[in-house]
């Protein structure tokens, strides 16, 4: 059997705000008076998943199952903000920022992608002896080169004891008894920003900085330091159980 599923979403936002000379509530700290601001944002995301399964038997006693999965996810967010202070006319609000005495423009784009492959193999003999092995290969865009991809295997064994011939005498009061054990590795990429592995640089303008007696109007400084060693968080798990 084969199944495919595609989901997506689009988003758009626009907001304009004007603070007159007598309005100070929630006005940005860097803003003069009067002050106007316009904000625009666009976003989209989609996920595409595919599942392919195949089951077959040999001599009615040996049952096999193979399942393959792929998943692709992409998210993108873009924004543009523009500010202006010192407009001559209130009626201009945020529609004529070029007429402001000072302007400020900010924009940004954040894009992330995730890709996953998974393969699972099941085998059972007469429904009594069960074996499962699976492996996931996950990749994300926001880890450093060489650490974007990792593998997460898992396996399990089970024995349906109640189907054995020596359990016939107890089937009236114990008709289901299964022992199982499993182990595997799981991965976690949550909590990491889209560009956390990169060092950010910013331009500082303000009134300039003096270096060796000279005013440098535009300077660049380092923001958040990136961590190129960031990679997948792994958890090693095992379990044992008795089902009755």
Spell out what each predicted region is.
Residues 1-19, 31-244:
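Extracellular/periplasmic, surface-exposed regions of secreted and cell-surface proteins
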Residues 23-24:
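Low-complexity basic/metal-binding stretches
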